[in-house]
Amino acid sequence: LGCGLGSSGAAIAGAVWASYFLRGLVPTRKDILTVGMRMEGYPENVAASLMGNMIVCGKSLDDDTIVSEQLDWPDKWKVLVVVPRYTLKTNDSRKVLPKMVKFEDAVANLQRTALIVAAVAKNDESLMRAVLVDRLHEPYREQLVPELATLRKVLSSFPIMGCVLSGVGSAILILVNQRFKDEVLQELKVWAESQPQMPALLDLSVDKEGM
């Protein structure tokens, strides 16, 4: 909880389903997503828990309709997560963000968003490695999660696709092909054991079914 792993989205999806069930109704995924977006303000977190795989979604400009598309996540792309022994307050995470961003940074992130979708759709590791870079929030939030910069250095010689914040943090996500996972995980264990407060390490696969 409170470390960027989507617990709020999962809780909302479960609560909406339960509210329908207790009234003798069976909600569709569209029902849950629509109500969940009204509660959270945006659909991404609820959609991820609800639908599984990789979800690209947004709100229609004309009404409250949610437009979403599901992409098959490559089976061999595994997710390692480092969870530090602290949580981040939402207000603190937001305070470090600038009120305005450079035009070129916004454009760079828009380009990379499209290219990340292409990398998943094409199962292209080289492309993912090249584009899994953020210029809108990580440069500011890494001061709150110093482990991010440290792990990027620790893993710089390993064939990972990326090392990024999970949500706003404090959890850190490492994307790696299954064939390299064990060696990367071993390096993470060595690093974790050297820390004053040993972080948790999660060895995960992407859920493909959702709720």
How does the language model describe each region?
Residues L1, D134-H137, S170:
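A short, flexible beta-alpha/helix-coil linker loop
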Residues L1-L5, G210-M211:
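Short, solvent-exposed polar/charged micro-motifs at secondary-structure junctions
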Residues G2, L22, V83, A171:
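Short, flexible active-site loop motifs that bind/organize anionic cofactors or intermediates
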Residues C3, S7-R29, L50-G52:
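DPxDG-like acidic metal-binding loop motif
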Residues M161:
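Short acidic/polar active-site loop segments enriched in Thr and Asp
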Residues L165-V168:
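Short acidic/histidine-rich active-site segments
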Residues A171-N177:
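Short beta-strand->loop micro-motif that forms the acidic, two-metal-ion catalytic signature
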